[in-house]
A protein has these predicted regions:
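Long, His/Glu/Asp-enriched segments that create or flank divalent metal/ion-associated functional microenvironments
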Residues: 1-256
Length: 256
């Protein structure tokens, strides 16, 4: 990230640790333990890796996160430049409570994490690039499986079969996904791909507006400095607070 000038990094290292049995039971998937956004006294986010799914009814192994290639993708998503960096930037940058807490929305948070996987992909080994695409396939499947289940257009067993046969998830993870869509967090899983598409479209719009003046590092620094604005407000902030000043500066230089 530093060598490719993708985004500014915190000075401290990211924290990655194994989950406790209680954490694995509460959330049996890799995740970021989010630091306090109000009254933070130096805490940072922690990338937590579960070692098992204690709630799994099947004895089948959940092997979706325990192979080497996926570690690159998980680190980009949960740690840097994904969740951990985004929350560190808000805390260290002094983002307002309104933007950091009250504006919280999954389209921003999960969209940024999935976008982070995409911007890191060109610099990863081939097997890790394939893992990035596999993870993106899962998020794109969520975008239609979740609403189809909740609208009664698809049965849980049909969705589970699709996840196992087409997306190639393990049986325990496929079941966990179905529970997520229909019980624990209906609608939330769609935010990953929706937010990702919004960020990709915003980047394309920004690059077209700036041409040779576009710089990934300053652009990404600006994005995370905005806190957790929803996509429409984030686009407005980028166009007015990032693109226009650069265009004005370029016009001033050419005018001189």
């Amino acid at each position: 990230m530093r060598e490719q000038h993708l985004i500014s990094l915190p000075e401290r290292p990211a924290v990655i640790r194994l989950a406790t049995p209680a954490e694995s039971a509460a959330l049996p998937a890799p995740h970021l333990s989010i630091p306090r956004l109000i009254g933070n006294t130096g805490e940072s986010g922690e990338f937590v890796l579960p070692t098992a799914n204690p709630n799994a009814e099947s004895k089948a192994e959940m092997d979706d996160f325990n192979y080497e290639a996926i570690t690159w993708d998980l680190t980009a998503h949960e740690a840097r430049p994904g969740h951990e960096l985004q929350f560190a930037a808000m805390i260290e940058g002094g983002v307002s409570v309104a933007r950091a807490l009250f504006a919280f929305n999954s389209a921003n948070v999960e969209g940024w994490a999935l976008y982070s996987e995409a911007i890191m992909k060109p610099y990863l080994p081939p097997e890790a690039q394939l893992a990035v695409l596999e993870a993106r396939l899962q998020r794109s499947a969520r975008a239609f499986l979740d609403p189809m289940l909740n609208l009664g257009m698809l049965k849980p067993d049909e969705a589970k079969h699709f996840l196992m046969e087409v997306v190639v998830l393990s049986e325990p993870l496929a079941k966990e996904e179905i529970d997520r869509y229909t019980f624990t967090a209906p609608g939330q899983a769609t935010s990953y791909f929706f937010g990702y598409c919004k960020l990709q479209a915003l980047r394309a719009k920004t690059e077209l507006a700036l041409g040779q003046k576009f710089r990934p590092q300053s652009y990404h620094d600006f994005i995370v400095a905005q806190g957790l604005l929803p996509p429409e407000l984030l686009e407005k902030a980028v166009m007015e607070g990032y693109v226009k000043p650069l265009q004005s500066a370029a016009a001033h230089v050419s005018g001189d």
